[in-house]
């Protein structure tokens, strides 16, 4: 999967999205998504990286629990052949629900 394909996949969720965070001063109403690559888990040996593997995090923010939107995100990940883990928390100071999806993406040219 290319980096552009990942961005297109995130866009297909159908809510505002940004890489890592929205620009300062552009607070988004919920729901919205932030996504980012968190390091690397490349396959390498003999001083050569053979395969780029990037841990992808997708954070879904909503006012309240949104089962339908979560199902949309999970369906998009699954239809793109990505297995994922999820966690959820309530951000009391922001009065928001956050669902975090993590997966590994094999990056191609």
Language-model-detected regions and their locations in the chain:
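Small/polar-rich, solvent-exposed N-terminal microdomains that initiate assembly or binding
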Residues: 1-44, 69
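Short amphipathic alpha-helical segments, especially helix-boundary/capping motifs
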Residues: 20, 31-34, 46-51, 63, ...
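A generic structural micro-feature
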Residues: 27, 48-52, 95-97
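Long, continuous compositionally biased terminal/linker segments
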Residues: 36-41, 45-47, 56, 103-109
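Oligomerization/assembly interface segments of phage tail-like spikes and tubes
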Residues: 52-64, 97-107
């Amino acid at each position: 999967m290319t980096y552009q394909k990942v961005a297109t996949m995130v866009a297909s969720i159908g809510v505002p999205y940004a890489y890592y965070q929205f620009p300062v001063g552009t607070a988004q109403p919920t729901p919205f998504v932030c996504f980012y690559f968190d390091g690397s888990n490349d396959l390498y040996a003999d001083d050569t990286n053979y395969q780029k593997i990037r841990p992808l995090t997708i954070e879904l923010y909503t006012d309240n629990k949104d089962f339908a939107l979560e199902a949309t995100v999970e369906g998009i990940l699954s239809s793109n052949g990505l297995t994922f883990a999820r966690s959820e928390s309530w951000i009391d100071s922001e009065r928001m629900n956050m669902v975090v999806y993590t997966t590994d993406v094999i990056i191609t040219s």
